[in-house]
Amino acid sequence: MNILRSLILVVPILCVISCDSNSKKSSIAKVAVVFQEDSLKFTKSQKVFIRDVISKSEKEVRNFLPNLPDSIKVIVEAVDWDLDIVNGVTGRTETNHPPLVLVQISHNYKGGVIESVYQGIKATVFHEFHHLSRGWAIQDNKFSYGIPNAMVNEGLAVAFTEIYTGNINDVNSYPKEADRWVKEILALPLDADYAQWVMGEHPDGRTYIGYRTGNFLVRRAMKKSGKSILELSDLMPNEIIKLAGY
């Protein structure tokens, strides 16, 4: 009887502790949006809208990738760049510790800032937050050097974004020669030029080779292994390359 009485008293206490712990975790797991403005400004309504889109996107990504770090900071900057090929928005994952993502929104994109947000910011958040979930960042990257690692990590982020947002850009599409491109990348030296092979233009005229080839590689790994994009996102680059048959 005493044991039963003790259990009756202890269980509610444990529930309170557990609920309080979950509540604290929920309150921490959020994104802080900061606007960096120079000559180009955001209006008050634009800021409210942008912040709302980023916040909702963060919640969606966290449902898919529960290991996404807490307390992410997103710095949003207004730019006059030509970002038409990426729906008016671009970004980069700067650091893992603290989790920091930079987003640039073009004032020159078609209908303006709000149109950019509608078309591109959700896709950018999904892409960059996928990088955060894996530790793929510019300043404190968790992966070793080499274009193959970049190909896989960018390919995962591209495929994840396309699958869960439906936002597909031609700049990330892969050609029929993609298999040959993968083999080219796997044969590259560790010090191969990142700009040429991943996110810029190659001397032979090809563009964004790493993103496009990575998208192909990840899709092929999914098809051959039967694994989902979320399952692949838990694997190391060399494992994904093997699953794709290379």
Describe the role of every protein-language-model region.
Residues 50-101:
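Auxiliary, metal-adjacent structural segments of Zn-dependent hydrolase domains
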Residues 27-45:
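Acidic/histidine-rich, surface-exposed loop or edge segments in extracytoplasmic proteins
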Residues 119-136, 158:
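Active-site recognition of the HExxH zinc-binding catalytic motif
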Residues 20-22:
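Bacterial signal peptide processing site
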Residues 189-246:
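Pan-zinc metallopeptidase signature
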Residues 145-180:
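Post-HExxH zinc-binding segment in Zn-dependent metallohydrolases
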Residues 107-124, 148:
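Short pre-active-site segment immediately N-terminal to the catalytic Zn-binding motif
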Residues 15-18:
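C-terminal motif of bacterial Sec signal peptides marking the signal peptidase cleavage site
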